[in-house]
């Protein structure tokens, strides 16, 4: 099989490749990573932990502003944990996480005049952020009510951004595996992804299977590149399969 992982598809899926290497002939990753930060300054760790646990609730606007300042996990390894903690905290503390609204904002944001009143009402009155577009409603559809959102609320807190995170040993095991991985390993990332921009550097040149492959840094596509760059992704994956 050919593995393709984006976002959690890489965080979870790459460790699946580690556990079942015989099932995969090649690997393709896009806008994802396999973070392993074992040398983060203890002051930063303490600051992030205190922020996570201080009991203050974040609004959507504050969280979105913090994420907009990120330069990507591969470009700012020391600053990323604090910025990403805003996302972790918002998701964990928001019982009715606005999944559909957030997805439409990241993929194809509605006009500002439609969005701004909703965000302001949410910030000052606590009203729910409901999806505006058919795309947003489609992403909201899998959740009949807020009780079904516990998974996506908890998952950001499982991203191992600190050396104290519980998945550290599994990440070490995964990197020990991929540092010896000789099967084709192709990276397809985007220049405008605020979350994982720069993470391709952790793979290219370190994973033996990346050598000699036509890795791509696509000019645009946001975080969910499969929404905007599906033709480029499909062509690159098809070419990799036919040539290897």
Labelled PLM ranges:
Residues 211-244:
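Catalytic active-site module of serine/aspartate enzymes centered on a nucleophile-bearing elbow/loop
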